[in-house]
Amino acid sequence: MGHGLHSADSATIGGGFAHGLGVAIGEDVKIGDGVTVGSFVVIEAGAHIADGCSIGNHVTICSGARLADGVHVADFAVIGRRPRLAASSTAKREELAGVRLGAGCSVGSHTVLMAGTTFGERCIVGDNAGVRERCTMGDGVVIGRSVTVENDTTIGSRTKIQSGAYITAYVTLEEDVFIAPMVVTTNDNFMGRTQERFKHLRGCTVRRGARVGGGAHLLPGIEIGAEAFIATGAVVTKDVPANTIVMGVPAKPVRPVPAEELLESAEG
C-alpha cells in the first residue's frame, strides 16, 4: 500500500488517501475518499473513517470507532478507548460500542474519548480533555481545554463547557447551557464511604439555557432551572428556580434574570 503503511488485506481505503510514516490499519477498517493520516497512527479493527477526515500524528483510532465526514483529530488523541475500571468503581461493566463522532467534529491534541459515547455534528473537544463512556452529546457542543466529562452524562445541543470544568457522572446538561471555567459538579454526598452511597449517587440537572459562573460548585442531585444564572464562586446546595440569579455560599436567590438576557430575547 505504500511506504510507511501496513494495512490488513480486509481493509478498504478510498481514493486520495494520504499518510505519513508508520501507519497501521487493522482488519475490516473502512476509510473514505480524501482522508489524510499523519505519522505513527494506529487504526484498529472495524473502525470506519468517512470522507474528508484528517488524522494527526501519533493518534489511535480504537476498534469499532465511527468518524463521519470531515472529522478532524489532532496529534496524540485516543478515540474510542475501552475503560479498565477499578474494583471499587461505580460505573457499569459491559461491552461498549465504538465511539461515534458526527460530521464536522474536531478533537484536540492529547484528548481521550472513551467507547460507548456519541457526539452529534460539529462538536468541538479541546486539547487535553477527557470524555468517559456512555455519554451523549448533541450537535454543536463545545468542550473546552482540560475539561473532564465523566461517564453516563448527557449534554444537549449548543451547550458550552469552558476550560478546566469538571462534569461528574450522571449529570444532565440540557440545550444552550453555559458552564464557565473551573466549575465543579458532584454526585456523592458520602464521598466514597459506605454501601449506602450507591443508592443515592446522582449528578445535577441543568435545564435549558442556564448559565453557571466560573468556579461555582453544584452539589449532588440538585436541579438548576431553565435560564437560571449561578454567580461566580457560588456553592449551590438546593434546587434553583427557573429565571433566577443566585449568589453566595451557600447560594441564595437575589433577583430574576433580566428579560433581555433570556434566550427568546437573545434569539429574537
Model-derived features: positions:
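Structural signal for interior beta-strand "rungs" in well-ordered beta-sheet cores
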Residues: L5-A8, T12-I13, F17-M247, K252-P253
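C-terminal end-helix/capping segment
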Residues: P250-L262
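Phosphate-binding loop/pocket of nucleotide- and phosphate-handling active sites
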Residues: S265-G268
